[in-house]
Swiss-Prot record:
Protein name: ATP-dependent protease subunit HslV
Methyltransferase is among the record's keywords: no
Main location: cytoplasm
PANTHER family associated with the record: ATP-DEPENDENT PROTEASE SUBUNIT HSLV, METALLOPROTEASE TLDD
Activity regulation remarks: Allosterically activated by HslU binding.
Species of the source: Anaeromyxobacter dehalogenans (strain 2CP-C)
Lineage: Bacteria, Pseudomonadati, Myxococcota, Myxococcia, Myxococcales
Binding site for Na(+): A166, C169, T172
UniProt similarity note: Belongs to the peptidase T1B family. HslV subfamily.
């Protein structure tokens, strides 16, 4: 049995608002297994939003670990992210987890990987955006264009960019879960 794959998660920051949007499609090989999965959630007593791309069970384990790191480091998103990335990279069992995380609070947007990466995207005209997953490049390109050439708020930028990604990427659908700070 092949692993489930394919998703799109987009984070947009604009004018003090932060939005993470994730599509709902889960595929197994060439079959859509679920259309309404929730790949985005709130953490840190509602002060952090997070989304994942990759194996679902792996992502849930990483969400739990990240929640613990947030508590250990007084809800400092950058510190918790670095500590999780270090543990993820060095722990023999965690190293096998296949997922990417996008985490954000009102001040930071970060991408975490099992390779130990903690990446904060560069700001673009009138905001910032980062995307992961199979539809990530499409959503990111659309979000950057909308940030640069429209006055849409963060939520509308995310919705429109995800709509475009769903039209292009066969592993992405239009059933969105959106969390906003």
């Amino acid at each position: 049995m092949r692993p489930m794959h394919g998703t799109t998660v987009l984070c947009v920051r604009r004018e003090g608002r932060v939005v993470i949007a994730g599509d709902g499609q889960v595929t197994l090989d060439k079959t859509v297994m679920k259309a309404t999965a929730r790949k985005v959630r709130r953490l840190g007593e509602g002060q952090v939003v997070a989304g994942f791309a990759g194996a679902t069970a792996d992502a849930f384990q990483l969400f739990e670990l990240f929640e613990k790191k947030l508590k250990e480091h007084a809800r400092s998103l950058p510190r918790a992210a670095v500590e999780l990335a270090k543990q993820w990279r060095t722990d023999r069992m965690l190293r096998r987890l296949e997922a990417l995380l996008v985490v954000a609070d009102r001040e930071h947007v970060l991408v975490l990987s099992g390779a130990g990466d903690v990446i904060e995207p560069d700001p673009v005209a009138n905001g910032a955006a980062v995307a992961i997953g199979s539809g990530g490049p499409y959503a990111l390109a659309a979000a950057r264009a909308l940030l640069a050439h429209s006055s849409l708020d963060a939520r509308r930028v995310a919705e429109e960019a995800m709509k475009l990604a769903a039209e292009i990427c066969i592993y992405t659908n239009g059933n969105l879960t959106i969390e906003e700070l």
